[in-house]
A protein has these predicted regions:
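Active-site cores that bind ATP or allylic diphosphates and position pyrophosphate for catalysis
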Residues: 85, 93-94, 98-228, 233-240, ...
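Charged substrate- and nucleic-acid-binding regions of tRNA-handling and nucleotidyl-transfer enzymes
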Residues: 324, 395, 401, 408-465
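Catalytic adenosine-cofactor/nucleotide-binding cores of aminoacyl-tRNA synthetases and other
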Residues: 35, 221-376, 448-465
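N-terminal Rossmann-like or analogous alpha/beta NTP/dinucleotide-binding catalytic cores
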Residues: 1-112, 207-221, 261
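Short, conserved loop/turn and helix-capping segments at secondary-structure boundaries
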Residues: 9, 40, 202-209, 243-246, ...
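Internal anion-binding site segments
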Residues: 369-403
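Glycine- and acidic
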Residues: 1, 28-32, 194-199, 247, ...
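Short polybasic/polar patches that bind polyanions
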Residues: 20, 51, 87-88, 217, ...
Length: 465
């Protein structure tokens, strides 16, 4: 249901990295037992977001596999088969309690200040009592018999030993009165029949492990190894939610984030390789990922750092890989009608140094192409600069452009450009600096003046002579 939350994406990433690092298989299963809320649109969106992140799966609903089908809604026959096995073994029983009776039990438990466990009679009902209700057509659920004493322990790969007292659980439902299996029963049957060896999931599923462990044992299945990762927190240390801003992978994709940056950042939410390095490709992560380096404590989602990291990844990309993204955006917004002269490549090389998101390129290009040069030159702030032999500086810039010196500086990237600007300023006895993101030129003695940028630099400067 819904969209792929960044928390779900991180969980998928950890499963992917673990499987790839161990030579295992990464399985995608669609858990759509909530028929009222589950939609095909949501499924397609989740699969699309996982693909965008580069998390390719080995088995799944779209590609099949040896243990399909991979949608829970298509596995009902299997669930009913195993529910019947539990019924025949006496591990479950039919419960004919009405919703009103169950509500009274909750009220009583609350008054007695005890866990709201099932206290109905059907766990010990006679065959005759059960048959009587069946003949009357009374709706019933399947309840699992939980031992009333003892405890259950598991060794979580992240949290270590975790235990529960069985008397806090009570008999729980595995099949609803409408014949639909509940989540805990489905995933147990699925993990067992699909031969899942490891389950890495969010810590909010930890309480479910108790029910699932009991079902595994009753069915005679070996239990997979579990690893429960901490929740992703907002800056205020509460659970990350929509009120904190964007939370889905799709939203970040639309905002102009790169998939490799998202993967890099999500991997660092609760994991590290033990060094100070913060930049990893997905291949690096596969090589270095180990479950024992995943932290127990919650990880804070820092949108500012994610944006910074995205900018670092963007600047490391060859411009050729950005051209299509830029051209597609500029054509869709009407900024660019056609490009046959290498304009997009030049623009990508120039702009990527000063932006953090793909979407920032729109405003950056508009700013670059529509800079109000003449208004700036005629302003009071520019007066002292213009009167201080500006035409000589302009002539020097035009000469540098005509000789190819300026083009060579641009070809050397942002660092090369900054070096050339400083050298030019020294030659003309001006204090010079570069505007980050605008690739512009400031000549001071006192106030800053943007003179131009990009390969069209000569045209506006010609008017200064």
């Amino acid at each position: 249901t819904g969209n792929l939350h960044v928390g779900g994406a991180r969980t998928a990433l950890f499963n992917y990295l673990f499987a790839r690092s161990r030579g295992g298989k990464f399985v995608l299963r669609v858990e759509d037992t909530d028929l009222e809320r589950s939609t095909k649109k949501s499924e397609e969106a989740v699969l699309s977001d996982l693909s965008w992140l580069g998390l390719d799966w080995d088995e799944g609903p779209d590609i099949g596999g040896d243990f399909g089908p991979y949608r829970q809604s298509e596995r009902n026959a299997l669930y009913k088969e195993h529910a019947q096995k539990l019924m025949e073994s006496g591990a479950v029983y039919r419960c004919f309690c009405s919703s009103e009776e169950l509500e009274k039990m909750k009220v009583t438990a609350n008054q007695m200040k005890i866990p709201p466990v099932y206290m109905g009679k059907w766990a010990t009902a006679s065959d005759a009592e059960v048959q009587q209700e069946l003949e009357k057509g009374t709706p019933y659920t399947y309840r699992f018999r939980v031992p009333k004493e003892g405890s259950l322990k598991i060794n979580d790969l992240i949290r270590g030993e975790v235990s529960w007292n069985l008397n806090t659980l009570g008999d729980f439902v595995i099949m609803r009165s409408n014949g639909q299996p509940v989540y805990n029963f489905c995933v147990t049957v699925d993990d067992a029949t699909m031969r899942i060896s490891h389950v890495i999931r969010a810590e909010e599923h930890l309480p479910n492990t108790l029910r699932q462990a009991l079902i595994y044992k009753a069915l005679g299945f070996a239990m997979p190894l579990f690893a429960h990762v901490s929740l992703i927190l907002a800056p205020d240390k509460s659970k990350l939610s929509k009120r904190h801003g964007a939370t889905s992978v799709g939203q970040y994709k639309e905002m102009g984030y790169l998939p490799q940056a998202m993967v890099n950042y999500l991997a660092l939410l609760g994991w590290g390789d033990g060094t100070e390095n913060e930049f990893f490709t997905i291949d690096d992560l596969v090589e270095k990922f180990t479950i024992n380096r995943v932290n127990k404590s919650g990880a804070v989602f820092d949108a500012t750092k994610l944006k910074w990291m995205n900018g670092q990844h963007l600047r490391s990309l060859p411009s050729d890989l950005l051209i299509k993204d830029f051209e597609d955006r500029w054509r869709s917004t009407g900024i660019l009608l056609e490009s046959e002269s290498g304009f997009a490549k030049e623009a990508a090389e120039l702009l990527k140094e000063g932006i953090d998101l793909i979407t920032d390129a729109d405003a950056a290009l508009c700013k670059l192409l529509s800079y109000p040069l003449h208004d700036t030159l005629s302003s009071d702030e520019a007066k002292s600069v213009v009167e201080d032999k500006l035409s000589e500086v302009a002539s020097g810039l035009i000469a540098a452009y005509d000789s190819g010196e300026l083009g060579q500086a641009l070809a050397e990237g942002h660092d090369g450009w900054k070096k050339w600007v400083k050298s030019f300023g020294k030659t003309h006895k001006r204090k010079v600096s570069v505007i980050e993101g605008d690739c512009g030129l400031i000549l001071l003695p006192t106030e800053g003046l943007f003179l131009g940028c990009f390969n069209g630099l000569a045209k506006p400067l010609e008017h200064l002579n």
